[in-house]
Amino acid sequence: LSYTTLFRSGSGTLLDSARLQCHIADCIDVDPKSIHAYVLGEHGDSEMIPWSTVRVGGKDIYQIIKDNPTRMNEGMFESIHEAVKKDGWEIFNRKGNTCYGIAASTTRIVRALMFNESVVLPISTYLDGQYGQDGVFTSVPAILDATGVKEVVEIEMTKEEKEQFDASCSHLQSFYKEV
């Protein structure tokens, strides 16, 4: 790995995405490994969830809700999102740190790099026109292999989701200007 490869990406929302998968899995009583869902944008208050892309065993989340209305409904989206954002703080307040979650995320990234996995992970990387964004490091699905970020995977989002993503990127850009 080159020095520049290591510093053009970060853990981003990988941990938040894992927490999201666990929350959804708890609602519908399936293994989190069966959930395909991402938290994108900033790792923080402006992060967003493109619910239209969430899949459970390949099945659209809205179809899951339709088929299982007693287990999950769209009204739960906001509470799940808030729980994902607050999970880290709850862990920190209880134990004084959150070292295991970020260690697991870092281990996942290192494994992808070391073993040339070409795996799609929601990590922070530099956008150069992807998603209509330029000059911002933010979390998006990216193919990670031994060279680092091989490719940014652009997923389709609804208009509202894209607006949320753009707002998150704008928030990050405004922070860059302050620094």
Residue ranges of model-derived segments:
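Short, small-residue-biased leader/transition segments that mark boundaries at the very start
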Residues: 2-6
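C-terminal substrate-binding/catalytic lobe of Rossmann-fold NAD(P)-dependent dehydrogenases
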Residues: 7, 14-179
